[in-house]
């Protein structure tokens, strides 16, 4: 699910989770998902990142809906937590304090926790925020495996459009309404993607992720070229002092 801030992405997720009632329209969720069928990974706040509990305790808390009114976790629930820690590669961190972990490790812990609640559907809200590039690639590798090998369905809100298009089966683009819904490979050719990738200012396209443009400095040769986005930009080559090397921006 992609879209600008305030477009309704998180609101839709909260509707799926039953945390908000729709003010209009109709939202239908399969019966088996209404109780223990959905695992949720919300955006982390600073307070959550500093949570003073062990990794095992955080993962086990995903079994709360299974535990009901019982004061203690059952052996089955502890086994589920252990299995999910092993699946996510965090067994060795079980007794470590959650707040001492890196951002990527914390995300693994929270996904293991979410898997304790369900094996059907994970809803992830901006899960890569604050992660470094290597941790982001590790994260996508992890959820790719969950989806393709363990058959866990994943709905993810993201601003990371490049990876979203590469990894997702389908893209839903919201802007208070549905601008696009369909296969990811069709999305990049849609008008919705064009608006998302570009801002218009006085009729001139301001390039973002899909376009590349150089700042004008002395000694530049300007050539108008058509970018992959379909817009025409002035691309520049900068001559490097002391040689004939040109740097394309």
List the model feature ranges, each with a label.
Residues 158-159:
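H-loop/switch region of ABC-family ATPase nucleotide-binding domains
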């Amino acid at each position: 699910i992609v879209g600008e801030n305030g477009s309704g992405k998180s609101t839709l997720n909260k509707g799926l989770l039953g945390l908000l009632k729709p003010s209009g329209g109709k939202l239908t969720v399969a019966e088996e998902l209404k109780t223990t069928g959905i695992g949720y990974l919300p955006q982390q706040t600073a307070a959550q990142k500093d949570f003073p509990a062990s990794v095992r305790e955080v993962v086990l808390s995903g079994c709360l809906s299974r535990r009901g009114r019982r004061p203690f976790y059952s052996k089955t629930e502890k086994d589920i937590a252990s299995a999910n820690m092993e699946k996510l590669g965090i067994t060795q961190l079980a007794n470590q304090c959650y707040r001492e972990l890196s951002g990527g490790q914390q995300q693994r812990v929270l996904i293991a926790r979410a898997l304790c609640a369900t094996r059907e559907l994970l809803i992830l809200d901006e899960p890569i925020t604050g992660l470094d590039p290597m941790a982001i690639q590790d994260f996508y590798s992890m959820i790719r495996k969950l989806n393709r090998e363990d058959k866990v369905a994943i709905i993810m809100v993201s601003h990371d459009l490049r990876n979203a298009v590469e990894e997702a089966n389908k893209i839903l683009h919201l802007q208070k309404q549905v601008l696009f819904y369909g296969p990811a490979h069709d999305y990049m050719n849609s008008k919705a993607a064009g608006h998302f990738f570009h801002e218009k200012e006085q009729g001139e396209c301001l390039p973002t992720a899909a376009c590349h443009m150089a700042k004008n400095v002395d000694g530049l040769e300007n050539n108008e070229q058509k970018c992959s986005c379909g817009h025409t930009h002035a691309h520049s080559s900068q001559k490097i002092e002391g040689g004939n090397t040109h740097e394309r921006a």
